Each structure stands twice: as structure tokens, then as C-alpha cells.
Swiss-Prot record:
It comes from Anaeromyxobacter dehalogenans (strain 2CP-C). One of its GO terms (molecular function) is nucleotide binding. Nucleotide-binding protein. SUPFAM superfamilies: YajQ-like. The keyword Nucleotide-binding applies. GO terms for cellular component: cytosol. InterPro entries: DUF520, UPF0234-like_C, UPF0234_N, YajQ-like_sf. This is Nucleotide-binding protein Adeh_0094.
Amino acid sequence: MPSFDVVSEVDLMEVENAFNQARKEIAQRFDFKGTHTELERDKEQNVLIRAGSEGRAEAALQVLMEKLAKRGVALESLDPQKLEPASGGHVRQLVKLKRGLKVEDARKIVAKVKESGIKVQAAIQGEAVRVTGKKRDDLQAAIHAIRAAGFPIPLQFQNFRE
């Protein structure tokens, strides 16, 4: 029976490349000179922006988002937190990376597939939703229904099997 998986993943190599490009651009750009603006990464692949002012932090976030978009990383996978004051009159902002399909989102996807009326079954399997059906056309209709729902997270469709 044909099936596919709905997942929400981020290519960490592309994130790493975009992060390095953004860091390099911030170090070389004239308007960032002397502003003590820097980007750091932690073990969870989150990005920490440190800057001398709110405007520089927002500009650094824009540079990072631009580089991620050019590398093909969905910007919906970013979760920028609020700007918070740091020592020495600086500000910092944590930008979290959304990875994996949360249970609430998986339930919404299953509900959307069921309410579409297509003859397929959707089941939650860990951090993925497996959709199975008798015909390939039904699965493609399910993919279109999920995309049309406009979920606020980046979704990929993998393991399309006959």
C-alpha cells in the first residue's frame, strides 16, 4: 500500500554554512564596524546574537535570515526570542531552531487529512506522520491538502513508497 511520511526537519549543514556566511559578513561590513556585534552557536544549534544596540541586533538577524533563505533553509524554522539587555549596555537575542514535529502539530495534520475527505489514513509515528492510501493519486491529493492548510512550520514529505 503506498505511503509517505510528513516530517519537519532542518538541514543542519546548510544552517552551519549560512551561520558562517552571516558571521563573515557581519565582521566585514562597514556599518557593523565597532558595534561589537557577533553571532554565536550553542550545542542545540541555536544562534545567540550580541550587539551594542537593538538596531544592530535586528540588522544582524536580517543578515542571518538572508543567508539562511539563500541556502534554502525555511525561515519558518526560526524562532527569534525577545531582545534582552546584557551587561555593558549591550543587547542579546536568542534565535531558536525549530526541529521535529511536535505532537500538537502532528494532531493538526492528522485532523486536516481526515477532514479533507480523501481516502487515506494518517497515523502519528514519533516525530513524523505516516499517511497511507490505496492509490498514489490519493496520496498526492493529501499532500496538496496539507500544503494548502498553511501550517506555520516547514513540512517535508519523505519516504514516498509504492
